[in-house]
Amino acid sequence: MTQTSHALFHMAQQCIPGGVNSPVRAFRGVGGDPIFIDHAEGPFFWDVEGKRYLDYVGSWGPMIHGHGHPEVLAAVHAQVNKGLGFGAPTAIEVEMAELVCALVPGIESVRMTSSGTEAVMTAIRLARGYTGRDRIIKFEGNYHGHSDSLLVKAGSGALTLGQPSSAGVPREVSQNTLVLPYNDLPAVVEMMAQFGFDVATIIVEPVAGNMGCVPPEPGFLEGLRAVCDQYGCVLIFDEVMTGFRVALGGAQALYGVRPDLTTLGKIIGGGLPVGAVGGPREIMEYLAPTGPVYQAGTLSGNPVAMAAGLATLRLLTVPGFHERLAAQTAVLCEGLAERAEAAGVPMQINHVPGMFGWFFAEQPVRGFDTVMAADSKRYARFFHGLLARGVYLAPSAYEAGFLSAAHGDTEIAATLDAAEAVLATLKEDA
């Protein structure tokens, strides 16, 4: 007998908090029960009831080649046959580190972790150890994982649940976290004039992907670089989402701004749990065992994850890969903008190569305030309309969507046809 998503969700709620292992999956942001996935291939996945969906989440970013790319699967199978993990150094983690250092402009040395959250925790500790300072600056709606000091006005699932900050975070932990509006350079300059020489680091998503998709305004990242240089603090780019996606060298290559530290995740693991933090040797040598800043992990550099990530990154080096991905993203987003205008439904469409944010709003979306002003209820209706037509978007108005190389002209055309039909119903509802 075929199980249903509804039945599985009911069962899950009896043994998993909220029925899910990451809050956004619970569909709280759009209503209804989540669909439970059985298998995936290329740009599609199938739920446990056998229905096929065009996937624009891609495991929240890692599946840049689509699901089940044969070269990635072959690399994983080969490593599994050699061993799942050893708790000791391996050649494949050296290969991975060498490739990351070669591809990312701001990285000369890299330390592997098991998640993006761990990578950011390490980067913050490293910045504090390197500078001898305590304060950090982050931006509203930027999500950097669920470590205590960064769960202050965070984006992603925290916004979906209407909890921009988390219970269980002591005031003493968060009091050194200063929060500023994203894309507001004058606010940064003003804050640094007051606290600059106490600030260890400014951490930023160079493209905010956890409150939809909000690119940086011209001059914003350059301004952060200049301010950090002025006050001697560490600039961290959280490229867990943008790394290897928006360009081969990440957002720092796309925008031409080099941070002091870079955090990575998602694509670097090819779908398996991996994170990384990297930067110049001068800073990275502060990490144990060569320096006084402690970091460790039982599964860090896991060989199966390294195999998946290495195969994924090598496929990205094929000439023209990111140009094609950018072109397909533009076709999708410009096509949706045309259809929304024709339907008389106000939408703001933000996109960078391989990522997009679709907002039901009259005014351009450039920061936290304008994200929150968008119509999340209309997004929920749009989401369910597309879901019924076999198109799976992020189940939250505050998450970016992702394209893969497997999303071809046929899939994009089918998506736009479905969107056109749903937009017509939204206009009627209005």
UniProtKB/Swiss-Prot annotation:
<dbReference type="GO" id="GO:0005737">
    <property type="term" value="C:cytoplasm"/>
</dbReference>
<keyword id="KW-0627">Porphyrin biosynthesis</keyword>
<dbReference type="InterPro" id="IPR005814">
    <property type="entry name" value="Aminotrans_3"/>
</dbReference>
<dbReference type="InterPro" id="IPR015424">
    <property type="entry name" value="PyrdxlP-dep_Trfase"/>
</dbReference>
<dbReference type="Pfam" id="PF00202">
    <property type="entry name" value="Aminotran_3"/>
</dbReference>
<feature type="modified residue" description="N6-(pyridoxal phosphate)lysine">
    <location>
        <position position="266"/>
    </location>
</feature>
<dbReference type="InterPro" id="IPR004639">
    <property type="entry name" value="4pyrrol_synth_GluAld_NH2Trfase"/>
</dbReference>
<dbReference type="GO" id="GO:0006782">
    <property type="term" value="P:protoporphyrinogen IX biosynthetic process"/>
</dbReference>
<dbReference type="GO" id="GO:0042286">
    <property type="term" value="F:glutamate-1-semialdehyde 2,1-aminomutase activity"/>
</dbReference>
<protein>
    <recommendedName>
        <fullName>Glutamate-1-semialdehyde 2,1-aminomutase</fullName>
        <ecNumber>5.4.3.8</ecNumber>
    </recommendedName>
</protein>
<dbReference type="InterPro" id="IPR049704">
    <property type="entry name" value="Aminotrans_3_PPA_site"/>
</dbReference>
<dbReference type="GO" id="GO:0008483">
    <property type="term" value="F:transaminase activity"/>
</dbReference>
<keyword id="KW-0663">Pyridoxal phosphate</keyword>
<dbReference type="InterPro" id="IPR015421">
    <property type="entry name" value="PyrdxlP-dep_Trfase_major"/>
</dbReference>
<comment type="subunit">
    <text>Homodimer.</text>
</comment>
<dbReference type="GO" id="GO:0030170">
    <property type="term" value="F:pyridoxal phosphate binding"/>
</dbReference>
<dbReference type="InterPro" id="IPR015422">
    <property type="entry name" value="PyrdxlP-dep_Trfase_small"/>
</dbReference>
<comment type="similarity">
    <text>Belongs to the class-III pyridoxal-phosphate-dependent aminotransferase family. HemL subfamily.</text>
</comment>
<keyword id="KW-0963">Cytoplasm</keyword>
<keyword id="KW-0413">Isomerase</keyword>
<comment type="pathway">
    <text>Porphyrin-containing compound metabolism; protoporphyrin-IX biosynthesis; 5-aminolevulinate from L-glutamyl-tRNA(Glu): step 2/2.</text>
</comment>
